[in-house]
Amino acid sequence: MRSQTASKTSMKPSSNSSAFSVRSSVAVSSHSAMVELKQRILTSLSRLGDRDTYQIAVDDLEKIVVSVPDSPEILPVLLHCLFDSSSDLKAPVKRESIRLLSFLCLSYTDLSFSQLAKIISHIVKRLKDADNGVRDACRDAIGSLSAQFLKEKEVENGNYVGSSLVGLFAKPLFEAMAEQNKSLQSGAAICMGKMIDSATEPPVAAFQKLCPRISKLLNSPNYITKASLLPVVGSLSQVGAIAPQSLESLLHSIHECLGCTNWVTRKAAADVLISLAVHSSSLVADKTDSTLTALEACRFDKIKPVRESLSEALNVWKNIAGKGESGTMDDQKDVSSEQCILERNGETDSVSCEEAGLVMQGSCDGLSSSSDSISKAVLILRKKAPRLTGKDLNPEFFQKLEKRGSGDMPVEVILPSRQKNSSNSNTEDESDANTSVLRSRSNGLCRTAGVHTKQRHFGDFAREKWVDERMNGGESRLRAFDGDHTEVIQADTSENRGNWPPLQRQLLHLERQQTHIMNMLQDFMGGSHDGMISLENRVRGLERIVEEMSREMSIQSGARGKATASWRSDVDGWDSPNYGPSSRNTQTSTRKIRGTGPSEQSGNSRRAWDKSSVAIRLGEGPSARSVWQASKDEATLEAIRVAGEDCGTSRNRRVSIPEAEAMMDEDDDNRGGQQGDPIWTCWSNSVHALRVGDTDSAFAEVLSTGDDHLLVKLMDKTGPVLDQLSSDMGNEAIHSIAQFLLDHTLYDICLSWIQQLLEVSVENGADFMGIPLELKKELLLNLHEALSTTDPPEDWEGLAPDHLLVELASNWNIEIQHFDT
């Protein structure tokens, strides 16, 4: 017995040690699995920075997230790896890490619920990133999380999960909006709008609590990006989450934004008013007066997109106020007063008036049937053709026509198909000309009033084409409004057929006069053209004579070497018409290009003096003046003037004339083999380099001359080509752009180049082209000064200049707050 007891006691510690060893082995294996999993994730994340392995790494990461076991211990490891990689220097790694955060939450909804606040806070912090792709990834991640978690799902205690989670999203976003960082404020506002739009079952009550905070931000002078926050109000309106108690303050803030100096903010305010009118019309129905007053005050904005949004907002708010319906009764009163005037003059047939009254009564019944038909009727009656009652075109002509005819004219009335009349058969024997002319007039006039008389037909004669086009456009709208098939009932009498021959004779007479005038005009134009060709040939002869004289004088004074300036001035203007009288009226900058010596600057100034001292206005020599004095015909004088202007722009063609080339070669030979004009040589080399696709050499040739006119012409000709330039040439071009920003006539060219500079900097990094810090600050400072003095062109389609300034400064990590001081 004692031995058995001893054996049992000896077995107990052995069993305990075996259990401990099993637990320790399991712990070691799980720890090794965690280490291996973390290593796989970090390896895949590091491969995201390479474009060749990017897609492979994305697939591997998604497989890892899907394949890991559903364990609470796994999620912290994944989140830790993704949080650390979000601060990586490479933009693709940061974008994919943020996307994987939302993908992880979608894959493990229950496990990630406890970590949701930490995940949202981390995503909001990433909004400070200068890369637009990272901020877009943050916006999409917030939208995915909102679609997954913001659902009106009731739990056991009667509360709703979606309503309680709105605070987790809104709190970090509002905190980000409170910071004095423009990109962070804008990104947070965009994320909040995405959160509201993406909610599957929007918790309206929780969303309504956001309105007071949003109104406070709109009224705050410290909140800069109001254009990004205003669409959030529109999103709240779309889901019906506008709090009635906050509506007054929101409208007041929106009205103030309509007068903002930033046109993007003004357009956003107009779009929000449209959204409120469409989705929250019941709330704003009794607050239309102040909004209409604000819209009327700024409806004539100088920016076209803003004007369009303001006009649309004004229309929808007028419809809510009920001011659009008054047009229907006013138009009906105008029609009734017209008929009464015609009845007093004895020119309206009683039967036609009765039928017209039936048509108007039927139309009024149709209008009262539904609100949709009322809105359609308002549009139709508003766009009807103007009444041609005042015969102010040619009163004597219409008086003669009235004396020839009687007061009875054929009248057509449009009736519904159920009121058919057998009188349709009476119109089949009428002539084709009579039927077509009568229907084209009476149909158009019956669509607006129902009945018109002969006098109105004659008043419509002079404006026949314009009225027919307007009426044809309104015919389809009228048919859609009536909804019934209509037919024309025509009552005609035989005694009225005698009224048409005089009218036809008048028409034929007018056609003959028009043909005669056209023939005279063609003869005159042909003679003028021949005279201009002859005059151009004579002027070219005069030019050749003047050039011969100039060449002989330059040969005689060749020892002094100053006669070549005339050739230099002409050659500079020959190459392109854009570098002549039609070029930009800018002053040549006297800036000194880096690397240019004082001798080159003195040569440039001497060349500019030579250009101004030998300017010759061709076409005004002694021969041209004698031709001018001898001519008495005004057309010939006009032709001489136009030919004289064309001579100034025809210098570019004279370069290709064989005689001019021979004269230049002969002049070069007489000068003893001297070199040609350096400006001409550099520009020719630049054009040749552009033709062969060597943009960098083209800019190098032009920049070596130090001539700003040539550089502006080349930049305008090629457009933004920073991605085709080397680092040295790119820095020279950027330096020139910084100088040109202070000239408002070159503002559009500079904006296009700065737009491309921002794009290539975002794509290739802030150190692209190795731009010096001083040059970056100079460009940003000049752009900041140009913002306060120059507005962007109306046809500018890129980013707003202030956005360009902020984006460039953010990309280059340069603080722009000190520019305002």
UniProtKB/Swiss-Prot annotation:
Coiled-coil annotation: which residues? 501-554
Q: Which residues carry this modification: Phosphoserine?
A: S406
Q: Which Gene3D superfamilies match?
A: Leucine-rich Repeat Variant
Map out region (Disordered) in residue numbers. Answer: 416-437, 553-610
Q: In which tissues is it expressed?
A: Expressed at low levels in roots, hypocotyls, stems, flowers, siliques, cotyledons, and leaves. Particularly present in hydathodes of cotyledons and root hairs.
Question: What SUPFAM superfamilies does this protein's entry cite?
Answer: ARM repeat
Question: What are its GO cellular component terms?
Answer: cytoplasm; microtubule
Q: Where in the cell is it found?
A: Cytoplasm, Cytoskeleton
Q: What happens when the gene is disrupted?
A: Right-handed twisting of petioles when associated with SPR2 disruption.
Q: Which key words are in the record? A: Coiled coil, Cytoplasm, Cytoskeleton, Microtubule, Phosphoprotein, Repeat
Highest taxon, organism lineage: Eukaryota
Query: Where's it mainly located?
Result: cytoplasm
Compositionally biased residues, Polar residues: 579-590
| HEAT repeat ranges, renumbered to this chain | 69-110, 114-151, 163-201, 205-242, 245-282
Functional note: Plant-specific microtubule-associated protein (MAP) that regulates the orientation of cortical microtubules and the direction of organ growth.
Q: Which PANTHER family match?
A: MICROTUBULE-ASSOCIATED PROTEIN TORTIFOLIA1 (PTHR31355), TORTIFOLIA1-LIKE PROTEIN 1 (PTHR31355:SF20)
Q: What protein name does the entry list?
A: TORTIFOLIA1-like protein 1
Species assigned in the record: Arabidopsis thaliana (Mouse-ear cress)
